[in-house]
Amino acid sequence: MRHLTRSLLLSAAVTPLFAANYDSPFLDNTAPTISTTVSLGGQNFVNQGLVGVGVFATNVIDGRGDTFGSFSSFKVDHNTWRKNSNGSYSGTLYTLPDRGYNVAGLIAYPARIQQMALSFTPDYTANNVSQTQLTLSLQRTITITDFAGQTTTAVDPTGATTLQGFSNVATAGGKFAIDGEGLAIRADGSFYVSDEYGATVYHVSKTGQMLGVITPPQALLPQFTGASGYSGFTTASGAIATGVQTGGRRDNQGMEAVDLTPDGRHLMTLLQSATRQDNPADNNQGRLFTRLSVYDVSNNPTPTSPVGHYVVELPTFDRDGTGGSADRAAAQSEIVALSPTSFLVLSRDGNGNGSGDNNRPLVFKTVSFVTLTGATNLAGTSYATGYTPVANGISGTLDGIVAAQVTPFVNLLNPTQLARFGIDMNVGAEGS
């Protein structure tokens, strides 16, 4: 029986498949100390509920002298992960901030990775406890530098799409423009960092130096009408208008997540939500059919094309949670690869503190299993090498294309389990 020790926050609700629409808050009422099990591919996965919470100080300064900005992604270095004699766990956690401060527009924020010491002492009781089970301490900041040793930037990528011998990369002011979103760790200590601007994946050394680039399939590269005059990876308002950008990753919905399979042989990359050609109306509820690529990195860490390209259907929900029809797709924020054909994915609404609207309830925040068994592999077809759509928004995938199967597993919205750690699901409440 396999326990998901890689997950730091655990709670559960298990149903066969995603419903077409979650029209009211999707909550889990499993009591503390009660575990649940899901079987996938002959393995049992056990969810022991929410067993730990930690608080990280907001006044920490990183190695570049900036206030600490994370976590767009975080991954445990499995070479360091240990269970200690007292039942606690410890290891090294690497975290990735995105494009920096979002208070006065985009800035020249250099991409970086934060190395942290992690200690985790699970609390398996039903008692109300303080938020002290998980502790993190910053050890060092790894600045990502390009092939010439200069830092990257986070401003809008309006520059050329070729730099230092690499094509189809986002640039600005002669620098690589990176909005870091996904992180994976190779056995040799090097990293994969995915970029939301370009839907690109960078391979960087353990010290942060770029070693190579994985450019995405053509289907994920932005495409604009010829009359618009736009090209490249710009996210300017005129370029991303409906009817102007006709294909490729949607702005601010690029390569959100990457991870390596446990054996290190395959890299999975997942767009945050649907491409523009798969949702031509560019409405929020039509962003449900996203794209997954699988790369064989066993011999070459930066292959030129994927061995797998699949459609993954995200859940949809009523943003107000009042029983209405779907008006949003639950975009994904992270994946954990389990095998070349299965992974975990975190899909969620955008409701909650910091969303700018605390009047809406929390509706959907769930970690699910995804299996590629039976799904249509589109690698090498015009769906991947061109802009042939796989879907038309909410109307479903095209005939002959089978999306990956999704099974909910860990429902983060468990009021009872959250409350015992002092977390209030009332989005307007202090500490929620």
Where are the regions that the model predicts?
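Gram-negative bacterial Sec-dependent N-terminal signal peptides
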Residues: 1-20
